């Protein structure tokens, strides 16, 4: 705890406590509540920036801003929160994306009080997941975010919104059981019953137990990260969710899966990671290629972007499995980069939908002439997504490629195959993204059409029209208006960071590199010990049997 003030607790509770006052606001039309929610979001993000600027040391790999209060001491459960190089950048990402998503939902007119209440609760839950140092608290926060997401999709979604929301809830809730089981198993193992992540990392688990725990956690986090074949909830959720909710789904919620893999699977179960790493690498290239091929087959704009996210998350898996400092760093940067890029693309897809009231790309075409600002911003976001040099996506994918190529644990043959297959996915990316640009913005096809009784807008027949942009008009008033000042501001806010990180990656990497090096050192140390005790454990020609002894020791991802 810095200076005796509970900074992280304040960051978590501010949106949650503020949401409780929304029913008391004298606001019938929802105009006051949107300013209130946006103000809370900005205040919390400013509080994050102030806290990390003044009280966080980027040169340290240890947990910082630690707060711990006994909650149920009989079972070792406490309110324990802290941040390190893995969690701190993701906390900032969550605050940035969620605040801008509330600004993106400026025109919501269907139950605005409930909408912004759920957004603020979701804000708190996301932060709680990333800062929880107690594994049971991590699980509670993980479950807490399910409720607002389910309601946000099922109430403000498209025609099949209830199906998509239920599918998301069932997938995530069922998978999260593995987090609870793994947490209980680790907490109850040995003489010391505790859920504290630092203390759990100090325990010496049998290899068989580690493998079981790793497999269970991989399923739980694989669902959230949209790893094939656990990804099928994602296209449905994105296809039916409103643009502001899709921004959070793609920008923050997917990253919870990657964060969980690094925090629990790598840090707490490094021995099991030695056995599962080639599985992660294989799943990574499957995600990259499968997501790219499926994305190209989609005619629904947001479903195409959803499968694009599946493809990009494959690079996170590949980097985590690389056993190299640069590879793990690339995985972290890919999560941050994709969070920004996916959020701006889903937002701009929503802006386009507000004008055309269709996501079917076959029904669009030529709207770039009528909406040049939207066209320019969408093009910039697309260039970032296909990893154009100068954009953040290029740096993150390049680091992952270098990490896999230079890995001294995998054989040259394995590295070559992985890099080649991943490169195929990289080639697919401009194909499906540039074709989307062509279908939507080029040509002369699209006729003015704004029929709320057709397509994805049919869902609002019985509940009124829910708008998420400035130009959501009735059929008789339909026009293609260009982006408003508010919409340009949101998109440019994302693009400035995307280009900034692409031009000078150290802006982001200096926040976490010390920590990722420590985590990778710990994993490589485990590999050395296992390879020395059982050199025949790896298939010949698939791995190299030995690596150089690490120069530093690491315990629970902290350099000793």
From Swiss-Prot:
Bilayer-spanning residue ranges: 5-25, 35-55, 86-106, 114-134, 135-155, 168-188, 208-228, 242-262, 273-293, 310-330, 331-351, 374-394, 417-437, 488-508
Function: NDH-1 shuttles electrons from NAD(P)H, via FMN and iron-sulfur (Fe-S) centers, to quinones in the respiratory chain. The immediate electron acceptor for the enzyme in this species is believed to be plastoquinone. Couples the redox reaction to proton translocation (for every two electrons transferred, four hydrogen ions are translocated across the cytoplasmic membrane), and thus conserves the redox energy in a proton gradient.
Source organism superkingdom: Bacteria
Reaction equation(s) it catalyzes: a plastoquinone + NADH + (n+1) H(+)(in) = a plastoquinol + NAD(+) + n H(+)(out); a plastoquinone + NADPH + (n+1) H(+)(in) = a plastoquinol + NADP(+) + n H(+)(out)
GO biological process: ATP synthesis coupled electron transport; electron transport coupled proton transport
Protein's UniProt name: NAD(P)H-quinone oxidoreductase chain 4-3
Source organism of this protein record: Nostoc sp. (strain PCC 7120 / SAG 25.82 / UTEX 2576)
Family, per entry: Belongs to the complex I subunit 4 family.
Membrane topology: Multi-pass membrane protein
Alphabetized HAMAP family for the sequence: NDH1_NuoM
Location of this chain's protein in the cell: Cellular thylakoid membrane
Gene symbol of the encoding locus: ndhD3
Keyword Translocase: yes
Primary location class: membrane
E.C. number(s) listed in UniProt: 7.1.1.-
């Amino acid at each position: 705890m810095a200076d005796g003030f509970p900074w992280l607790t304040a960051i978590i509770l501010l949106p949650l406590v503020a949401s409780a006052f929304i029913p008391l606001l004298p606001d019938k039309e929802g105009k006051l509540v949107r300013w209130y929610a946006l103000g809370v979001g900005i205040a919390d993000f400013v509080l994050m920036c102030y806290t990390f600027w003044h009280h966080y040391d980027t040169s340290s790999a240890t947990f910082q801003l630690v707060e711990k209060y006994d909650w149920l001491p009989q079972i070792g459960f406490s309110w324990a929160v802290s941040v390190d190089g893995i969690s701190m950048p993701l906390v900032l990402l969550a605050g940035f994306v969620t605040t801008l998503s509330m600004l993106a939902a400026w025109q919501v007119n269907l139950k605005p009080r409930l909408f912004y209440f759920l957004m603020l609760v979701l804000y708190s839950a996301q932060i709680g997941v990333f800062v929880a140092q107690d594994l049971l608290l991590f699980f509670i926060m993980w479950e807490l975010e399910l409720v607002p997401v389910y309601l946000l999709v099922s109430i403000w979604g498209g025609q099949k919104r209830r199906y998509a929301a239920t599918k998301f809830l069932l997938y995530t809730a069922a998978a999260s059981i593995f987090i609870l089981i793994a947490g209980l198993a680790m907490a109850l193992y040995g003489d010391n019953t505790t859920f504290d992540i630092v203390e759990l990392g100090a325990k010496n688990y049998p290899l068989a137990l580690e493998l079981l725990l790793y497999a269970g956690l991989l399923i739980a986090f694989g669902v959230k990260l949209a790893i094939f074949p656990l990804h099928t909830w994602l296209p449905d959720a994105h296809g039916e969710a409103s643009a502001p909710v899709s921004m959070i789904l793609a920008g923050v919620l997917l990253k919870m899966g990657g964060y969980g893999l690094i925090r629990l699977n790598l840090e707490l179960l490094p021995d099991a990671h030695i056995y599962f790493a080639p599985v992660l690498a294989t799943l990574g290239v499957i995600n990259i290629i499968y997501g790219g091929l499926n994305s190209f087959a989609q005619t629904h704009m947001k479903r195409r972007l959803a499968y694009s996210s599946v493809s990009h998350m494959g690079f996170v898996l590949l980097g985590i499995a690389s056993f190299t400092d640069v590879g793990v760093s690339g995985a972290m940067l890919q999560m941050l980069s994709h969070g920004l890029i996916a959020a701006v693309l889903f937002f701009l897809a929503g802006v386009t939908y507000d004008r055309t009231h269709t996501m079917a790309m076959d029904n669009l075409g030529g709207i770039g002439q009528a909406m040049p600002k939207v066209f320019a911003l969408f093009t910039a976001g697309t260039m970032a997504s296909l990893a154009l040099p100068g954009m953040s996506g290029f740096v993150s994918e390049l680091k992952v490629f270098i990490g896999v190529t230079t890995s001294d644990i995998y054989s040259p043959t394995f590295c070559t195959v992985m890099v080649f297959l991943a490169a195929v996915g990289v080639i697919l990316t401009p194909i499906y993204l540039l074709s989307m640009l062509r279908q939507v913005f080029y040509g002369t096809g699209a006729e003015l059409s704004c029929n709320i009784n057709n397509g994805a807008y049919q869902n609002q027949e019985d509940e009124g029209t829910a708008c998420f942009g400035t130009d959501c008009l009735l059929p008789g008033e339909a026009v293609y208006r260009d982006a408003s000042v508010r919409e340009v501001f949101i998109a440019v806010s994302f693009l400035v960071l995307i280009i900034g990180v692409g031009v000078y990656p150290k802006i982001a990497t200096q926040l976490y590199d010390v920590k990722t090096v420590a985590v990778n050192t710990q994993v490589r140390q485990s590999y050395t010990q296992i390879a020395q005790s059982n050199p025949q454990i790896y298939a010949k020609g698939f791995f190299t049997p030995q690596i150089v002894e690490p120069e530093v020791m690491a315990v629970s991802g902290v350099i000793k």
